[in-house]
């Protein structure tokens, strides 16, 4: 089983990594093509393109300017440890064992607007470039056109390497839309995490994002390889709902969030 998750806007390059092992991103030639184009934009143009403040636009202009394809532990950090935010709070990679990192390296991928697809131990230099960014480029009108079927093809390779055709989608719609299903040789398993609010079970963004991270960690630590085993997920009060689920769309409900 291969999992995909979204990246995060929040990054941590201050905390020392809990593992010294690292790998190099596999598709840096594509990243470099984007970087060269982004370097042509002023900070104000970056702010407008990304719909962010002048401060964040300036920060990312500086990041694009200093980006170099020579990735080392001195200028980059393992992607799974660099990303922060709700999904990564749930995943809590800082407490994984070396054996867990080995398993994650085979069975987890992070979708990325700049890097396309990242493995957990791939070094990553800081950036912000969301997949939904309408950056016109030589390949089309936006990043979905830029990546085309490449991400699906790379996922096919990763699926083949780890031994089955099961793809567990724990990414947002914005990011999973970069996966072209017609080019994907996989059985896709989707998940929904709902919390009780005002008498109804609803998807609450903050909790759902964290739950995707919790599920990722569950799969890594339990070495899950059968979709039926996913139904055993009962972390932080969630339970599987057979009533609301369909064959490849698993729904988990929770009545009370932890304090």
Curated annotation (Swiss-Prot):
GO terms for cellular component: cytosol. Pfam families: H2O2_YaaD (PF03883). Transmembrane segments: none annotated. It comes from the Bacteria. One of its GO terms (biological process) is response to hydroperoxide. Belongs to the UPF0246 family. This is UPF0246 protein PFL_1025. It comes from Pseudomonas fluorescens (strain ATCC BAA-477 / NRRL B-23932 / Pf-5). The lineage of its organism: Bacteria, Pseudomonadati, Pseudomonadota, Gammaproteobacteria, Pseudomonadales.
């Amino acid at each position: 089983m291969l999992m995909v998750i979204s990246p995060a806007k929040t990054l941590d390059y201050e905390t020392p990594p809990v593992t010294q092992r690292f790998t190099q991103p596999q598709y840096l030639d594509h990243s470099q093509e984007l970087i060269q184009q982004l370097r042509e934009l002023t900070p104000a143009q970056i702010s407008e393109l990304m719909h962010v403040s002048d401060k964040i636009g300036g920060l990312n202009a500086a990041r694009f300017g200093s980006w170099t394809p020579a990735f080392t532990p001195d200028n980059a950090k393992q992607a799974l440890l660099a990303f922060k935010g709700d999904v990564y709070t749930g995943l809590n990679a800082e407490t994984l064992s070396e054996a867990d990192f080995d398993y994650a390296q085979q069975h987890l991928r992070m979708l990325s607007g700049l890097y396309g697809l990242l493995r957990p131990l791939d070094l990553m230099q800081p950036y912000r470039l969301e997949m939904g960014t309408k950056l016109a480029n030589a390949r089309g009108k936006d990043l979905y056109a830029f990546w085309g079927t490449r991400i699906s093809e790379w996922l096919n390779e990763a699926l083949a390497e780890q031994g089955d055709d099961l793809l567990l989608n724990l990414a947002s719609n914005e990011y999973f839309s970069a996966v072209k299903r017609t080019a994907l040789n996989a059985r896709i398993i989707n998940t929904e995490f709902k919390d009780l609010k005002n008498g109804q079970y609803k998807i609450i963004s903050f909790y759902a994002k964290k739950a995707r991270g919790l599920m990722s960690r569950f799969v890594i630590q339990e070495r899950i390889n059968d979709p039926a085993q996913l139904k055993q997920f009962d972390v932080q009060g969630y339970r599987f709902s057979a009533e609301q689920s369909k064959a490849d769309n698993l729904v988990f409900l929770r009545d009370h969030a932890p304090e």
